[in-house]
Design a protein with these regions (language model features):
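Short hydrophobic/aromatic beta-strand micro-patches
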Residues: 96-98
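N-terminal, polar/charged subdomain of small-to-medium soluble alpha/beta proteins
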Residues: 1-92, 102-110, 114-144
Length: 144
């Protein structure tokens, strides 16, 4: 069974995740993949590497999933994030949302991505073609 929430080193599988999103009540399915690209702010990127505090990341992702379902009236929601080295063109994160109508699924997927960047303890390091590395700005809001 494919989990609703995952933080893993293995490559992410969008088609497997899509299979758990099948729902006869949903008229819309949005499957967003955030992928490693070859540039950032004009610098050529070789690869990305993600680190996480996995137990808290999984907890925060589960809370985001619950809030997205409630806030947008989703029928289903899944969030998978990769950690470790992510080569160019491979998915670093997948957010899948389904709802009766498309607007809710699109809005929910965008909201989840924004919240991941703000709340979830997952950090991205970029390795550049010149051999240098840089942590990408990460600011998190933790709610107690």
């Amino acid at each position: 069974m494919i989990p609703w929430i995952a933080v893993q080193e293995a490559p992410l599988d969008a088609m497997a995740l899509r299979s758990v999103m099948e729902d006869p009540h949903a008229g819309a399915l949005v499957l967003f993949e955030g992928r490693a690209r070859d540039h950032h702010e004009g610098r050529p990127v070789l690869e990305l590497a993600y680190e996480a505090y996995v137990p808290m990341a999984e907890k925060e992702l589960a809370l985001l999933r619950e809030k997205a379902i409630e806030r947008y009236g989703l029928t289903r929601c899944a969030i998978h994030h990769r950690i470790g080295v992510v080569p160019l063109t491979e998915a670093a994160v997948i957010v899948a949302t389904s709802s009766a109508h498309r607007a809710e699924s699109f809005q929910a997927a965008a909201w989840v991505m924004d919240e991941i960047k703000q709340r979830v303890p997952i950090w991205k390091r970029e390795k550049y073609r010149d051999g240098s590395e840089s942590w990408v700005e990460c600011t998190h809001r933790f709610q107690m």
